[in-house]
Amino acid sequence: MTAERLPHVRVLLATYNGVRWLEEQLESTLRQQGVQVSVVASDDSSSDGTVELLQRWGSRDRIQILPPSANRFGSAHRNFLRLIRDAEPGDADFFALADQDDIWLPDKLLRAVECLSASSAQGYSGNVTAFWPDGRVQLIDKAQPQRSLDYLFGSPGPGCTFVLPRSVFLKLKAFITEQFDRLQTIWVHDWLIYAFVRSSGGRWHIDSSPLMLYRQHGLNEIGVNAGWRAAMNRWKLVRSGGYRRDILAIADATGVANTVVDSLRHLNLADRMALILRVRAFRRRFSECLILAVLLMVMPRG
C-alpha cells in the first residue's frame, strides 16, 4: 500500500438462491468507505435469478463471477473453499468473506483494515447485530478474551466478518489448494480458517464493535447459534460424532498434534477427565466451558 491509494479489499462472495437479499448485500459491500472494493462471486447452481442479478451488477461494477461448477457444492463451506482456491488475488491488500444476505455498515472494511494494522494481527473478525423479519435485533457478542486452544473447538464468530491480510490469504490459498479434497468433509469454513491462522502462531483480533447487520431467516445455513433449537442441533451433532470428527479433521489438516488431540482421538474415561480439567483453555465464555465439559462426557468414541 502507498499513501496515495486506498487499501484494496477483495471480497469473496458465496451465493445460493439468495436473490431476494443479494442486492442489499452488494450495495452495502460496494459502498464501503475508505477502501477500494472488488468482489469475486461463486454461485452454487442457483435457480432463482441470483446468477442473473450478479451478471447485471458485474456488467457495471467491480464484480467477477467464477465459472459455474459442474456439480453442486452443497454447502457454504465448500463454496468458500472453491472461492479461496480459485479467486485471483490481483493487487488486493486484504481479503474478506461475504454471505449473500447481510447488510454491511459503511465503515466495516475500513475498521477491519485499521484493526489489523494497529494490532499486527493475522486475522480479523467481529461482533454482529442479528436482525429478524419481525423487527427483533440482538447483539451477537463474540469478543471474549481468546484462549490458548479455543481454535480447536470452534470459530471466533461469523465467517462473514473475517478479513485477512494478503500474506496470510496467500498462505491459506496454498493450504486449501493442496488439501482441497481432504477438506471437503469439514462442515464450517470459518472455524477452519481460524484454526489455520492460530495453529501456526498467528494472532487474531476479535472486534467488539458490531459493523454488520446479520440477517436471520428460515434459509440460513448457520445463523445465530442460540436458543433451544440451536442447543438441540449442537447436541445432535455431538451425539452423532460429527463435532469430534470435525475437531480431529481440523487438527489433522492444520498439523496440530498435542495431548488434547490425542485425548480426543482415544477418548477413554481418563482422557475425558483430562480434557474436562483443561476445558478453560478450549472456550472463551465460562458458560461454554461448562457446556463443553458435559458434552465431553457424552461424546461418542466412534
Predicted regions and their residues:
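Nucleotide-sugar donor-binding/catalytic module of glycosyltransferases
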Residues: 2-228
